[in-house]
Amino acid sequence: MAARKETGNTAPIAETAVKQVQIDGLVVLKIIKHYQEEGHGSEVVQGVLLGLVVDDRLEITNCFPFPQHTEDDVDFDEVQYQMEMMRSLRHVNIDHLHVGWYQSTFYGTFVSRALLDSQFSYQHAIEESVVLIYDPIKTSQGSLSLKAYRLTPKLMEICKEKDFSAEGLKKANVAYEDMFEEVPIVIKNSHLINVLVWELDKKAPVTEKHELLNLSSSNHLEKSLQLLMDRVDEMSQDIVKYNTYQRNVGKQQQQKHQYTQRKQQENLQRLSRGETPLPEEDVNKMFKPPVTPSRMDPLLIAGQINTYIQHIKGFTSQNLGKLFMAEALQDQTN
């Protein structure tokens, strides 16, 4: 997973550090090319975003990929690789300010603990950092899917304190809707590129417009539903584990209470016989409390479930619209 070397000087968290992300068209093409060359199936590709901050707008002007490597490549130093790349870009007078990272996704699967830790590391070091999520499957169906996300101030505070217990999340009032905030994206090209795109569009052959009504998302919908069911199963298992923890805590509290009562009765009997009462013992040392499970993983699972649901809603609404348009065209031909 992408990592960012933290620095000692970090600015305080602002409510709206970045209100808009402006991306050069070249960066978008580099991200797409990176996945086409190295991404296969569910394999994730990642890279570094470079640019600068202008007021409340983050301008991403360049990027470079992380090379594919395995855990066995002990000689590969990711931080050293980033520093060498940034020094090389500085020598050729290219923007080299580290402003975030990008990652591809497989059927919208990106809400994970690894992404949370990486984005926290970036955002803690550089306040304006964002993560770009590129969906190649949705893009292959005709619409570019590229979104920018940041961790919310609430989640940043929780990650700093590292209190992922149920009480800590409840105290911070953090739900799955409060984990990530989406930042609007604007893709910018130079005037020469815009003219070239206009000329290419004029020269492009006219395709059959009825192809737009093709319901080609059945496989995508089936896979999204399968992934959704898997996450729901994970959530169900986690609920069972947490309920077991709560029962164990209740049993232990009852055992502590029974032990304390027995100890008091025994001391009263010893005093009535004129004997010295037994010394007091630390009950908490005698009864080791159960390990409190982290509630961050269920929160992330809930966020991923919500992402799948939004994707499914988008595809089903598109298909319903296509069905209505196809019906209208059929009525006209008849």
From Swiss-Prot:
Localization annotation: Cytoplasm
UniProt GO molecular function: metallopeptidase activity; translation initiation factor activity
Residue ranges annotated for the MPN domain, each copy included: 21-155
CDD domains, per database record: MPN_eIF3h (cd08065)
Region (Disordered): 247-284
Keyword annotations from UniProtKB, A to Z: Cytoplasm, Initiation factor, Protein biosynthesis
HAMAP family per record: eIF3h (MF_03007)
Protein family: Belongs to the eIF-3 subunit H family.
UniProt-recorded name of the protein: Eukaryotic translation initiation factor 3 subunit H
Provenance organism: Xenopus laevis (African clawed frog)
Lineage: Eukaryota, Metazoa, Chordata, Craniata, Vertebrata
